[in-house]
Amino acid sequence: MIPKNSAGNARKKEELTPVKAIIESSLFEYLSDIVSQYYDLGKLISVERNETGYVNISYHIQTLRGGERKQYILRCYRQGTHENKIKFEHALMKELPERGFDLAPRVVVTKDGSTYAKVPEKFAEGNWATCIAVFSYLPGEDRYSWDAPLCTSEELTNAAEVLALYHNTIFGWEGAGNWKEPRIIEQIPLMVKQWRAHVKNGGNSVFDLYFAEHSDYLLETLKESMHYPTRAVYDTLPHLAIHGDYHPGNLKFLNRKISGLFDFDWAKMDTRCFDVGLAIFYFCTSWEVNSDGNLLVDRVELFLDSYQKIEAEDGQELGPLTSPELESLPHLILASNAYVLDWTIGEFYTTHPDAEKYARYLQHGVRLMKWLGENWTSLMDLVLTKR
């Protein structure tokens, strides 16, 4: 935590270098100004950065108002994030509690009633505005991450149930504003072009070399994946506002149950079964040294069995995955791997992060692609037993 006036109060002063102390003090002042100028939350008293995020920067903050302490999450959206995307995310989060889904955080409105603040910034490159949002703080523990996802069987069962509940709750909502992203079936052809360009312009890092070595295999796998499901089939599958990033790191746990679902910044309109494919990719793929990239079929089966127990609510047409969805699901697990690989590759060549760290993500995705190729028939047979 960074308390008011001095980060040194949170730890021995000798542990803070002068430069770090200045940075933390400046950060506190910056966020304190935002909270007081744009929100009616009282006085900011502590700040702690959430180190797990990759795209946006989030902080766990505490405020004091009328003698009462309250906790929130403050998010600084990455520069270049389209405001209509933010509006879509916030409209979805507003819709969920109105439909009875109480596991998601609430968006805290600004003094002028907006769901986010636009904070003017001045940089050497020019002036622009940073979008800031504040969310209610969810109870529970952060136990896992997307690259350390192997929760217990009981937690895995509950995760599938919560995803099914989320889908059943939001089905029928048609979105808000003018925001529209390509569906995964439209993204795959774009990935082929982008990956070719990255290979052509790559450097000599461990990431570049591994990507170049496996690029032909990846591109061929992508092109083959475009054959099914066809657009005609895909268009008939149930569409809804998918979470788009449903993994154990975006869940809070209290005792043995899920107490919160957060990070809706990847939400978009797409098929329900793509969201399920993404969840299976995240929850059921090993990151262990001797089995990295293996899809753990016992976990896949447990996840699907738990998801399929959902029943359609009165007036809803959703429910368990249908036969056409199950027939498409293995293809969408592969597409989910490609989707995350596309993020990994794009993030590396855009922001130039640690090459070894991102090479690990890349290797994981390549290994899963190969596992899927070698075990395709058995995976398809398993999934189709859930009809």
Tell where the protein language model's regions lie, with residue ranges.
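Active-site acidic catalytic loop and adjacent metal/ATP-binding pocket
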Residues: E51-L64, E68-I73, V107, M226-F274
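ATP/Mg2+ or Mg2+-diphosphate-binding catalytic cores
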Residues: V19, Y339-R387
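A glycine-centered beta->alpha junction motif in the catalytic cores
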Residues: G113, V134-A148, A197-N204, A338-A355
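An alpha-helical support segment within catalytic cores of ATP-dependent transferases
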Residues: L27-Y38, W195-G244
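Active-site activation/catalytic loop segments of kinase-like enzymes and analogous catalytic loops
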Residues: C273-Q316, L334-H352
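A cross-family kinase active-site recognition segment
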Residues: W146-A212, H239
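Conserved NTP-binding catalytic cores of kinases and kinase-like/nucleotidyltransferase enzymes
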Residues: M1-S114, K257, L384-R387
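ATP-binding pocket architecture of kinase catalytic cores
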Residues: E68-G177
